[in-house]
């Protein structure tokens, strides 16, 4: 059967002014009706407008340099060597049907700034699309770029997909005084779906072995048995910074809970979008609704203990029209359905043109979204 990749762009992210409104759904071949891999990518805002970028394929002489401009602001970041061959890119997919999307999770603020870093998250996406053919090669390119030229953005979750595989890569910079980033990448098992929406989602992961490698053995990533890859210093850097106990076991280390701990807004405003998608395709998600509403249980390390799984197996095969509907979900049918409250007006509008939070007598409250 002819393999093809389908990516749904409901709204491409333009200049984003600190909004937490991006959502990605990731679907493997075995989870879809037509055997396609799919990812979605939205920047949900009434003041952002869709756009498509185009980079034609090219062959470049040795010594050619390319300018890097920060995607969000247009700020000049620096130069990096151009690849000898670049691929045709339209939007967030290239001629080899490699596609990349993202949502910003932020994470620990002391890791956001890295003086001299060149590669911001947007440039990382579009440079990689010009240089890689597959999801695995994209992970190599992305992690190599930040190691060589530094990482100039907040923490990011990336969706990376080709016609055969879907991966989630989560990355956060090392802050001032060090170049690069720490990261973990995991392949979504075939037949499963995954999602992220401005909250880091990778928790514990398999340690180095047959199916998992650190970046010390990056060449092994092309072995199809490998389904997890992580930065060689992802544990030691956290211990060095005091984010994880020196005596802490690597086997119980959670990337998200260490580098981007989930709080009330991370659950109620972000993870709840993941829950809505999972709930639409799997009948066993009700126990996680309390967590998605912001009621987080924690262990002695401060790790959340009632989080949703990173991926789930849907009850049925999913088609692209359903995926489009899932991206339009407003928590209909739940107690948080805003189309049914007085503010919805006669047309049951689920939107409210207002900030997400407000204060009364010094106490902060949340608006639903």
Language-model features: locations:
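Substrate-recognition/cap regions that form aromatic- and gly/pro-loop-enriched pockets
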Residues: 336-369
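A contiguous strand-loop segment
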Residues: 22-121, 141-299, 306-310
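Short, well-ordered beta-strand elements within core beta-sheets of diverse protein domains
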Residues: 125-131
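Mid-to-C-terminal functional-domain signal that highlights helix-capping/loop sites
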Residues: 288, 292-327, 334-337
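Sec-dependent N-terminal signal peptides
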Residues: 4-13
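Sec/Tat signal peptide C-region and signal peptidase I cleavage site
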Residues: 15-21
């Amino acid at each position: 059967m002819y393999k093809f990749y389908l990516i749904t762009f409901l709204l491409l992210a333009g200049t984003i002014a600190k909004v937490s409104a991006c959502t990605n759904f990731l679907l493997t071949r075995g989870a879809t009706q037509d055997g396609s891999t799919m990812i979605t990518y939205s920047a949900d805002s009434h003041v952002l407008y869709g756009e498509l970028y185009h980079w034609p394929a090219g062959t470049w002489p040795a010594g050619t340099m390319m300018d890097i401009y920060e995607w969000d602001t247009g700020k000049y970041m620096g130069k990096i060597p151009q690849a000898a061959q670049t691929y045709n890119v339209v939007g967030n997919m290239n001629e080899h049907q490699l596609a990349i999307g993202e949502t910003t999770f932020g994470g620990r603020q002391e890791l956001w700034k890295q003086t001299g870093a060149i590669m911001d998250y947007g440039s990382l996406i579009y440079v990689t699309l010009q240089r890689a053919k597959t999801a695995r090669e994209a992970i190599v390119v992305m992690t190599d770029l930040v190691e060589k030229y530094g990482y100039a953005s907040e923490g990011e979750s990336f969706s990376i997909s080709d016609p055969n595989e879907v991966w989630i890569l989560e990355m956060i910079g090392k802050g001032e005084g060090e170049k690069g980033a720490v990261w973990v990448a995991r392949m979504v098992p075939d037949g499963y779906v995954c999602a992220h929406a401005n909250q880091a989602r990778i928790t514990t992961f398999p340690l180095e072995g047959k199916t998992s490698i650190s970046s010390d053995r990056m060449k092994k990533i092309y072995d199809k048995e490998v389904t997890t890859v992580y930065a060689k210093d992802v544990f030691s850097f956290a211990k060095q910074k005091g984010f994880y106990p020196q005596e802490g076991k690597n086997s119980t280390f959670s990337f998200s809970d260490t580098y981007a701990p989930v709080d009330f807004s991370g659950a109620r405003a972000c993870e709840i979008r993941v829950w809505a998608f999972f709930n639409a395709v799997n009948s066993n998600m009700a126990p996680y609704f309390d967590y998605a509403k912001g009621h987080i249980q924690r262990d002695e390390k401060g790790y959340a203990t009632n989080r949703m799984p990173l991926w789930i197996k849907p009850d049925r095969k999913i088609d692209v029209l359903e995926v489009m509907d899932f991206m339009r979900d407003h928590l209909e049918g739940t107690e948080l359905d805003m189309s049914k409250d007085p503010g919805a007006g006669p047309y049951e509008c689920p939107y409210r043109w207002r900030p997400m939070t407000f204060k009364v007598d010094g106490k902060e409250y949340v608006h639903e979204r």
